[in-house]
């Protein structure tokens, strides 16, 4: 079973006095839309807006999905609303289908037969309300699952960073090491400095041959 459909708020999807006419998943297997392929639309000049699998839903140009169901033995339809995702619209359809057709309903999701709260009457307003609640419960469930997955991924990434730091500290004997050469952007800086200290110092004296004077200069004269 898809995990997105596994759990819904107890206030709405509890098995209570308002349980689905298909009372228990073990009593019978509901007829699913996935096992009943749709016929191709007769119109050829228009874009197909129906979903290829889900019943009762159509896509608008805006990308959103609308849902409506035909009332049994009537030409009229019950409008269930516009939804941001096809799954929400498909879930709304299941509520209305169960309310109007009971066990003979063709469902989009197998668990709709026993998880959804079905209105006690076939009043269009009651069906619309129940369908809206089912769609919102589905949205809340998928949002919760998405947030949980993101939080788990973030926690796993943080744990990976901490594990890497711990292993690096163990390899260094618990002593923090800073690579000054990498920090200064001067590789082999200290090695070159050590080699320079082994060289003899440069000559700082001077040679009298380097003097450009015209003759010897006597500082003292004893002839006088």
From Swiss-Prot:
| CDD domains the record matches | AP2
Entry's induction text: By high-salt stress, drought stress and abscisic acid (ABA) treatment.
Q: Where is the composition biased (Basic and acidic residues)?
A: 160-170
Where do the record's region annotations for Disordered lie? 20-45, 141-172
Query: Is the Secreted keyword given for this protein?
Result: no
Question: Keyword Iron-sulfur, does the record have it?
Answer: no
Mind listing the GO molecular function terms for this protein?
A: DNA-binding transcription factor activity; transcription cis-regulatory region binding
Q: Which residues bind DNA?
A: 53-110
Domain of life according to the entry? Eukaryota
GO cellular component terms, alphabetically, are: nucleus
> Motif Nuclear localization signal, which positions?
38-50
Biological process according to GO: abscisic acid-activated signaling pathway; glucosinolate metabolic process
Query: Could you tell me where the Low complexity compositional bias lies?
Result: 141-150
Which keywords does UniProt give here?
Abscisic acid signaling pathway, Activator, DNA-binding, Nucleus, Stress response, Transcription, Transcription regulation
| Subcellular location as annotated | Nucleus
Q: Which Pfam families match?
A: AP2 (PF00847)
Looking up PANTHER family in the UniProt record yields: DEHYDRATION-RESPONSIVE ELEMENT-BINDING PROTEIN 1D
Q: Any idea what job this protein has?
A: Transcriptional activator that binds specifically to the DNA sequence 5'-[AG]CCGAC-3'. Binding to the C-repeat/DRE element mediates abscisic acid- and dehydration-inducible transcription. CBF/DREB1 factors play a key role in freezing tolerance and cold acclimation.
Q: Member of which family? A: Belongs to the AP2/ERF transcription factor family. ERF subfamily.
Q: What name appears for this protein in its UniProt entry?
A: Dehydration-responsive element-binding protein 1D
Per the UniProt record, the source organism is Arabidopsis thaliana (Mouse-ear cress)
